[in-house]
Amino acid sequence: KAFTTVYCSINHFELNCNHLSISLLTLMNKKYLIIGAGFSGTVLAHQLVKNTDCTIDIWDERDHIGGNCHTERDAETGIMVHKYGPHIFNTDKKEIWDFVNSFGEFRPYVHRVKAMCNGKVYSLPVNLHTINQLFGKSFTPAEAKAFLETLADTSITNPQNFEEQALRFIGKELYNAFFYGYTKKQWGCEPTELPASILKRIPVRFNYDDNYHNNIFTGIPVDGYTGIIKKLVEQDCIQVTLNKKFEPGMDTSAYNHVFFTGPIDAWFNFKYGRLGYRTVTFETFYADGDFQGTTQMNYCDEDVPYTRITEHKHFTNWEQHNKTIYFKEYSKETGASDIPYYPKRLEQDKALLLRYRQDAEALKQVSFLGRLATYRY
């Protein structure tokens, strides 16, 4: 099999091509089309070329490679900007870490998120410092754990939705402060309308660890993610065509196989309806010096229209910049012309996905991979 060690881990996204059970014998002297020049498509292209005798065309509808991980230098400040929101590379697998580092230098980075709530700044994920701040206490870990147990709503024995799941384990005080307003803004509905599975494990730490990620390997590429992806496809037998949008029904008969990394419902021209997504928009601001002192500040209050502010200079703390650039991020329902970000995965979406998957399994010359094609967060 060609893809036993192909992984990419960006935030919560892990591409694992190990499920593609295509023998090397069937991949010799072939021509392939990959739709999408993000991490999924470009890692796949690199591994196909490395392990087989083939030529590859990659199409992407945008004017750049990198997908939502695209990074670029801001012309005004010189700061490396995460164009579609923050992405931190994190993994526990050494083979993944070694793989990406073979295409560019990564430097250590600890992602520390702060939260603005009722005019005060707190530490996230919810940890011992957060609990002591919110309640004006100086609990030890054991005391904090015992205290939260008194706040938990034990009358909820079988949580049926997001809100019940939160109230069952952390109580209304922490829920109202850090989860209710933010969740409502991010998902565009009441938390009671969201499945409990979204909040499978309440992110509460009974220590002062405020590192957002627990992974062994975490870092930021010195030359940005787009620099890494550019090197992945710098091979004569890989041809990347930008500003080329895939349209359902396009003739792909010139290719032995097509690998699709776009939304699975788009491949089928939304014939059963659109899968539910939330998208985000960004408002760009410039300032002198340092705006907020951290990479990411979440705004938990419902009356603040944006969900978070990302200040990009803090991703690369080894660089020095006199000015700063930051994004205010707004969440909204995904329209036909919007970029899909977060799958809603409500019950109606799961039913719809099952129908698309059944159709996808019937396609012998097409494979679906990546977060959009598999409808995963």
Regions found by a protein language model. Give the residues of each.
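Short FAD-binding loop at a beta-strand-to-alpha-helix junction that anchors the flavin cofactor
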Residues: 361-376
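Dinucleotide-binding Rossmann-like beta1-alpha1 core, especially the glycine-rich loop
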Residues: 77-153
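Mid-domain catalytic core of redox enzymes
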Residues: 51, 244-359
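N-terminal Rossmann-like FAD-binding beta1-loop-alpha1 element of flavoenzymes
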Residues: 32-57
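Active-site/ligand-binding neighborhood in enzyme catalytic cores
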Residues: 118-123, 128-257, 261, 268
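Ala/Thr-enriched low-complexity intrinsically disordered regions
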Residues: 2-5, 26
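Glycine-rich FAD pyrophosphate-binding loop
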Residues: 49-73
